[in-house]
């Protein structure tokens, strides 16, 4: 596991908090449903997610106008969500999404905006 910056640590911490609050969703189909029904406020896709997963979710984000970032790893996102690996996360609360997005924008190690 790579050494991560303070901004990404905060992102993972907030993702975990959102999960415990019931405001984070994982799984490609569930994420695409949230995007489709306007429940998503922020999508984070792991940098090491498969090309098919990235394309599928980013296409949905572009079509429905959802905010999407490619940042972090599957392992780190998974640990934040209480799993071993997780390719993508959808934040369904505007407050959590805004806070996480602020930290993603400050992250100097990545955080590609789509």
Name the predicted role of every residue range.
Residues 78-114:
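C-terminal structural segments of small proteins and small subunits
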Residues 58-86:
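Mid-chain, well-packed structural core segment of small domains
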Residues 29, 48-49, 73-76, 94:
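Short, ordered loop/turn segments at secondary-structure junctions
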